[in-house]
């Protein structure tokens, strides 16, 4: 019995780590596709959301054959919340994250997005839901200092990061904070895979208004582009989320969140080694501060969260 429990726990740990690694690599692969293969970011977000949404809904039906994937549509209030979550949560966080990568790089975009828990702390304090603690103050200070060093390399006179990437990265973090807080009752009632699957598909349909998925020139695609697209759209999005959620069957939510901190580490390492993104000395200090902050925040009890 003990050996069986240990084996299941190990399975959960592996699933959580693999899911986080896929997320981190997915961002770096997206960076590669934008900069070296001229993939349009608008089309990519559309394809990523539509394909991943359909994939997750199919997975849900396979796992729950007796349940309807349309159950959320039977309650008008829940449907309204799903639509809000799909547009203000899923669509904004996915587009802003990819836009930050496109105008900067995957490492900085991922780090800026992962500051989201600090925005949640500030929001809860402003609303009076929680009192400001010493931990919260230290987290805010570490965020400001780490972000300042990452973006300026310690200089008060200039940015070493594209301002557009900074804007989109901060927006991605704010959207992720909303994405984390808002859908709790949806998740409790219908489950993560169904809600995220529909949110991706609905936001993907909305993105088609900006850039239809069929408006793409594939004549210059080679096998490498196709393989990277499959990884970025399926592996780095749908499979990453599925593995992460599946790990919750075997380990606690706190442990899963802790192992999820591998994501920004992988993004930074992959960007440095594969795409040769160079970081200056004080930027490296800022990266270390933000990673320590992410680790500490993962150990602190947070609202039930989803990921990008």
Language model features by range: what are they?
Residues 1-47, 158-185, 205, 307-308:
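Glycine-/small-residue-enriched transmembrane alpha-helix faces in small-molecule transporters
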Residues 10-15, 42-62, 84, 139-145, ...:
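Hydrophobic alpha-helical transmembrane segments of multi-pass integral membrane proteins
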Residues 56, 60, 132-153, 207, ...:
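Hydrophobic transmembrane alpha-helices of multi-pass small-molecule transport proteins
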Residues 33, 44, 48, 100, ...:
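Hydrophobic/aromatic residues within transmembrane alpha-helices
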Residues 20, 47, 90, 94, ...:
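Helix-helix packing/entry segments at the starts of transmembrane helices
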Residues 55, 116-141, 265-285:
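C-terminal transmembrane-helix exit sites in multi-pass transporters
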Residues 2-5, 49, 153, 225-227, ...:
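C-terminal-most transmembrane helix of multi-pass membrane proteins
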Residues 64-107, 149, 233-251:
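Specific transmembrane alpha-helical segments of multi-pass solute transporters/efflux pumps
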């Amino acid at each position: 019995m003990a050996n069986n429990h240990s084996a299941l726990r190990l399975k959960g740990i592996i699933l959580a780590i693999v899911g986080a690694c896929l997320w981190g690599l997915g961002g770096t692969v997206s960076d590669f596709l934008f900069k070296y293969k001229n993939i349009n970011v608008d089309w990519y977000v559309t394809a990523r959301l539509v394909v991943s949404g359909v994939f997750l809904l199919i997975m849900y039906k396979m796992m729950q054959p007796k349940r309807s994937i349309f159950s959320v549509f039977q309650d008008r209030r829940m449907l309204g919340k799903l639509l809000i979550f799909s547009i203000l949560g899923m669509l904004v966080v996915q587009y802003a994250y990819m836009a930050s990568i496109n105008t900067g790089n995957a490492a900085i975009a991922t780090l800026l997005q992962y500051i989201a828990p600090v925005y949640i702390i500030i929001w809860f304090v402003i609303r009076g839901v929680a009192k400001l603690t010493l931990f919260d103050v230290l987290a805010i200070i570490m965020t400001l200092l780490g972000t300042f060093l990452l973006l300026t390399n310690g200089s008060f006179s200039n940015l070493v990061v594209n301002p557009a990437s900074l804007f989109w990265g901060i927006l991605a973090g704010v959207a992720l904070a909303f994405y984390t807080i808002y859908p709790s009752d949806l998740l409790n009632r219908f489950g993560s895979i169904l809600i995220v699957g529909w949110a991706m598909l609905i936001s993907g349909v909305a993105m088609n208004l900006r850039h239809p998925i069929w408006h793409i020139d594939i004549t210059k695609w080679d096998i490498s582009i196709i393989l990277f697209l499959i990884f970025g759209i399926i592996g780095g999005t749908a499979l990453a989320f599925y593995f992460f959620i599946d790990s919750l069957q075997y380990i606690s939510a706190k442990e899963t969140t802790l192992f999820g901190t591998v994501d920004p580490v992988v993004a930074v390492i992959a960007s440095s080694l594969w795409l040769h993104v160079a970081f200056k000395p004080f930027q490296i200090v800022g990266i270390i501060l933000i990673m320590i902050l992410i680790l500490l925040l993962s150990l602190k009890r947070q609202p039930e969260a989803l990921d990008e």
